[in-house]
Amino acid sequence: MVVMGNGPLKGTVATSGAKNAALPILFSTLLAEGNHVFTNMPKLKDIESTSELLNSLGCETKWVGDEFHVTVNKPSSFEASYDLVRKMRASFLCMGPMLAKYGEAVVSQPGGCAIGSRPIDLHLDGFRALGATITQKEGYVHAGSPKLKGGTFLFETVTVGGTENVMMAATLADGVTVLENAAKEPEIVDLAEYLNKMGAKITGHGTSVIRIEGVAKLTPAKHSIMPDRIEAGTLLIAGAITKGQVTVTKCVPAHLEALILKMREAGFKIETTKDTMTVFPCDQWEAVDITTAPHPLFPTDLQAQFMALMTVAHGTSVITETVFENRFMHVTELSRLGADITPKTRVAVVRGCPGKLTGAPVMATDLRASASLVLAGLVASGETVVSRIYHLDRGYEKLEDKLSSLGAKIRRIE
């Protein structure tokens, strides 16, 4: 991706459907045979990878105009192979549905972005609490249970994937399951809403205690994927960093309160409605500190983009990453553009240098890091070339087209 610094962005831009809601919802289709229909499904590499995995399990996936259809048949095999799972961590989310519906699942241990260990132990402990037998051998996890039984399970640490996987498994268990210290992310709420449309009985989603009353059967439904709050936040920061005026539509500002609060604290004027947010031109902004944490606090998935904004702020900002231990890989690349950042294990000190970034060749290391490099490139003088943008395609739908529509000089070269 070649990015030229080109002054303020101006205009209106819409967000796509949320990747992090779409993936668990697609895997949840395994709970109900028949035809599931989705709207607002983003066209992303991770959606392609999920389709490939579902197809390998006997499903049929296809686009019908703007709708995405998943036809679920009884799988000929209950194994999700290494070749498919290594592309994307979220693939492990097929385990809960298969285990609940068919009593067995064999899933390769996961891959995805290299931003920390993100262990699957909490998922497996949750399955065990529902009565499943788990064995691990030769890089695969084998789970089996004639019939899952409801129970109470406390997550030792907050885990989004673990909450989703165990919640899906519990929908078909005998009796009531209570998940304590559950994750509260909006994407979990979207998943629970789809499961309830299929006939599940879930309450408490969006709080730290989720209650699932098991049912005998689920049936396919139709659902619109929620807007992507991380993409919305990235686009808002793009407007801010270029001193532009950008309105982001088809979003839910209530999902981004932590980001909006910090941007206002830095000096930006931001106006919101129920489903839009506008950032106004700001000549200079102050450095502010952030600490990432599970929702509703500052999202780790916006940490890299916010760091880009802080590289050109007035003053010094301290960025603390509490969610993943290896999430400062963008620091060395931002430094190549002239940013002044001192990283330690989980803390980065960013000394703002407004107007001092200059274009250079940089390399994306993960999905959100790639976005931060594009944002920095928008305000660096000269040309910034971001390589390995396949990371970007995993989670952003046509980001260069959206930024171009706002006046950015950005193009993709093969």
Swiss-Prot record:
It holds the Pfam family EPSP_synthase. Its EC number is 2.5.1.7. It catalyses: phosphoenolpyruvate + UDP-N-acetyl-alpha-D-glucosamine = UDP-N-acetyl-3-O-(1-carboxyvinyl)-alpha-D-glucosamine + phosphate. The active site is at 113 (proton donor). GO terms for cellular component: cytoplasm. The modification 2-(S-cysteinyl)pyruvic acid O-phosphothioketal is found at residue 113. It is an enzyme of class 2 (transferase). UDP-N-acetyl-alpha-D-glucosamine binds at residues 89, 118-122, 301, 323. It comes from the Bacteria. It is found in: Cytoplasm. The keyword Transmembrane helix does not apply. GO terms for biological process: cell division; cell wall organization; peptidoglycan biosynthetic process; regulation of cell shape; UDP-N-acetylgalactosamine biosynthetic process. Phosphoenolpyruvate binds at residues 19-20. Signal peptide: none annotated. Belongs to the EPSP synthase family. MurA subfamily. NCBIfam families: murA, PRK09369.1. PANTHER family: UDP-N-ACETYLGLUCOSAMINE 1-CARBOXYVINYLTRANSFERASE (PTHR43783:SF1). Cell wall formation. Adds enolpyruvyl to UDP-N-acetylglucosamine. This is UDP-N-acetylglucosamine 1-carboxyvinyltransferase.
